[in-house]
């Protein structure tokens, strides 16, 4: 495991889970609610009956609750952070489907599960694979090799165009944000490379400057296309929420209790939801 991988693992191992009680007074509670709602809707859009699910970058298992009432047969959770996996294992107790956990880096290690997955997902984690072309290809091949024909790969990921546009508005150092979040470009951010363009992302109560990378979704889409996988869904989070809040009003009212504040909205606008299908 190289230095950058160690730093990511250490970073997420140190993040403390927020209890339901503390969540109510969280400064980014609106962001958490919207993100959870959109991840739930994305899963429901593409999950199949009796599904095998592979979760790349599963973290502490926060999305296990979103699969609880879905037609899942077997779940495989993969994460680089060992302490996070311990909590995920604890959260899996009592679920109706089988669960397996792998302590591995999906952007450098070869991931092999016992049976092909109907759904592979990577929620807010796949952008770490864009540290290099090699790591992106390894991550993409882990998706491709573990996905059955007709299976779907879903991911929620930062939008490079939004990040670049906001950074360009600050001619001094390219950083941007507000009281709740901040993006600080690293020297590599300003290169013309397709990979390894880094920035530090700070998010209140969640992220404290872990190095992240601009995504190159055009490259990923072409790479998948060469393997017989096609993009079938792509939308920014703001458009997604504006559609899904009306598509399932009951779920929206149950999961999203608050209106996003003016400081929370720019955080939501940083992300996209995307899906690919293996033909």
Whereabouts are the PLM-identified features?
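Rossmann-like AdoMet/SAM-dependent catalytic core
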Residues: 200-279
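SAM-dependent methyltransferase
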Residues: 154-226, 232
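A short glycine-rich, Lys/Arg-flanked "PGG" loop and its adjoining helix->strand segment in the class I
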Residues: 135-149
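Conserved alpha-helix/loop element of class I SAM-dependent methyltransferases that forms part
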Residues: 30-51, 66
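A short acidic, Gly/Pro-enriched loop at the edge of an enzyme's catalytic core
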Residues: 111-120
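Class I SAM-dependent methyltransferase SAM/SAH-binding core
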Residues: 62, 66-108
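N-terminal, positively charged/glycine-rich alpha-helical extensions of SAM-dependent methyltransferases
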Residues: 1-23
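Conserved class I S-adenosyl-L-methionine
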Residues: 50-59
